[in-house]
Amino acid sequence: MEWWSMTPTEVLKKLRTEERTGLSENEAQKRLETDGRNRTEQGEGKKSFRRRFLAQFDDFMILLLIGAAVASVAISYWNGEKDFLDAAIILAIVVLNAFLGVLQESRAEKALEALKALSAPKASVLRGGEEKEIPAEEVVQGDILLLAAGDYICADGRILENQGLKTEESAITGEALAIEKEEGVLAEKTLPSDRKNMVLAGSYVLAGRGTVAVTATGMATEIGQIAALLAEQEERETPLQKKLGETGRLLGMGALIICGIIFGMGLLRRQPPFPMFMTSVSLAVAAIPEGLPAIVTIVLAIGMQRMARKNTIIRRLPAVETLGSAEVICSDKTGTLTQNRMKVTRLAAIGKGLEQDEEKRRFILTLFTLCNDVKRQGTKIIGEPTEKALAEAAEEGGVSLKGLWEEMPRIGEVPFSSERKLMTTVHPSGGKWISVTKGAPDVLLEKCTRCLDGGRQAVFDGRRKSEARLKNGEMAANALRVVAVAFREWDEEPLFFTAEELERDLVFAGMAGMMDPPRPEAQAAVEICQKAGIRPVMITGDHALTAQAIAAELGIYRAGDTVLTGQELEQMSDEALERAAEDCTVFARVSPAHKVRIVKAFQKEGRVVAMTGDGVNDAPALKAADIGCAMGKNGTEVAKGAADMILMDDNFATIVEAVREGRGIYENIRKAVHFLLSSNIGEIMTIFVAMCFGWATPLLPIQLLWVNLVTDSLPAIALGVDPADADSMEQPPRKGNSLFSDGMVSRIALEGAMIGMLALLAFGIGHIYFDEEGAYITGRTMAFAVLSLSQLIHAFNMRSEHSLFRISPLGNPMLLLALFIGCLMQIGVIMVLPLAEIFKVCPLNGTEWLIVGALALTPLPVVELEKLCDRRRRKK
């Protein structure tokens, strides 16, 4: 339908909706059920259980194991034997492993989907006459969208009202140009690129405001099949997953070579070829950590959910890895370091006696109320904190907001922009017109040629300008945020509502000073940062004196630090900025464009940088930073789309908590990797050493596969949810350290060798002291039990680099549960006779269990001693 060629009235009639009230909730729900959710379907969609299950077998080692089981059946059948039990057990374990793989994959996917839903875009619509914020997926045809600067446009629509609306449609056109919109009727044959009375899904609002009737949603939009912000699917591997995948493949090759050597040695020692082949294949399957990337995904997803409960939504998995190595946090001041609850504490104007001049005070407050975007909802004033504070001050000063807005409605505006640092509105005024401009004093004063002095207008000469600047400086020095207001009277309605037309030859009226006190928790968070080797930096559009005063109160600014302003940045080369950034903790009067330079200056020093932002123009800085942090409450959808993480409470302390969690998650992944690799090396060592010395095979193929099943998944995942060490924020950032740094490789090798030696010792004791001559069943049973149980016990060693006596044994209930289930399963296959027969083991007596228990517990004291030596070495 050619919506662009219809009048707004015709569009509303066709859509069966009302401009002032929108759809009712019931009607919107009906349309949602009929038309479906507002999203573009993308990719293959969710895999079925069958596809997921079959995908688990798409692995060379698993296929080799199945082939070995089939060969076992064929050989048994060829030899006229009826014993297919080994093959059946191997296949059963393979199938059980596949089910566990599907379960892990499903859990990770559900967790990631839940997190995507939390960070999905929102839309402001009229429903039943009330403005509501709803998930963008719930927008339907006929909804009335209310657009403002920074909003993500989630549906195609026809513009009904337009107030300086400009959009960026690069997601559709490929060109990042600002497109000025209009509301007039266009010809039917107007090209898509010229339909300026339409907005398109996948674009966003650069400036201005608008009211739009939704004409198409989901697959019916122009963007159609193109992947836009709303349906963003990020399935790329994270750097850590890639690294682990490569590590796994390397270890896999090593395991295959060792298993090949074991097979060859077995043949040289005249061992039966087929049992040796089965042992080698089973060992390879058990020893290769093919589940590492999947376990890491689960650990990351669980960590992300935990962070979501603490008001941090992670949008991209790599952000979790990067968080732990953050060295600089560049934070906005307002709302992040402060309470975002401004209160006007002082008014100033040219001349004296403002405190006694009630009429002039009321006039200044009236101007601030006219040039203001706040709204009243019941008894509450809703809006941006600065504007809300001005409106509240006006009400307290006797100005009726409702009466003023009805008497002097807004007929035009030039919206605020970070570049101009000004906002202007136009109103009728007693048969004439008045334009009101408010904004940064240093910018606004330059636009003024006259001023109010006493009860009259006067020339804004050098003396009066100096007086205004002095009063501005005094308020700023007292950490007040200062906003100035000016006006211009018009005999006729202005022809053009542009900054060039309206923001000149103004009459300076006065200034308001307001305070946004620091958040109580921000000071403690700054202190934690500094202990953790993280440098907090304040970035603000406020006056330098205001910023410095707040930063000093928070502990960000210290004696010897410097403060840089946007004006100084403009005059600096990139090299000079890099040098200046070394001592700078406060950047004041900066624009969003400056933020990118600040980020790059720190990055050139080799620092990992986190940056906060909330506006449309903050998006480049958020993308440039190693970790982009968007604001959840006051952030635009564009900023959220560019960010790696979203702070749902806009709080600096939440960033610090996220860094703590990020460090904990990274350490937990290290723990899981350490545990898996040391356990797998233990399994290889058990068989390899036995072959080297010409001993009988300590473990049978099905026993190796069972150990792999019991010890690999549950304990590793349980380690992934371990609470972070209490001193995690007292350590310096990782700064690109390898996953295997701090001697981890040697510890893995030594601990793996220890586990292997314990299993061999159990095999030797069982065979020599408890087996009948020529039998190995007790020795194998004891080796089987020790190998499995010692790995489960060893998981506790992974919990901390500190002594286990320093942490709570009940601190990780999931690990206790994994240990209980693993021990129960292991003891069950030995002590339950039918299972013992299947696994070719025998029930153990009390003495044998005591020996098994003593050997299985050995990793605890040995690793405690290793940790003690390591701590002493580090101190030296």
List each language-model region with its residue ranges:
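Generic alpha-helical transmembrane segments
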Residues: 711, 755-756, 780-795
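Long hydrophobic segments that form regular secondary structure
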Residues: 763-770, 775
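Membrane-interface starts of transmembrane alpha-helices
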Residues: 85, 775-782
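Alpha-helical transmembrane segments of multi-pass integral membrane proteins
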Residues: 747-762
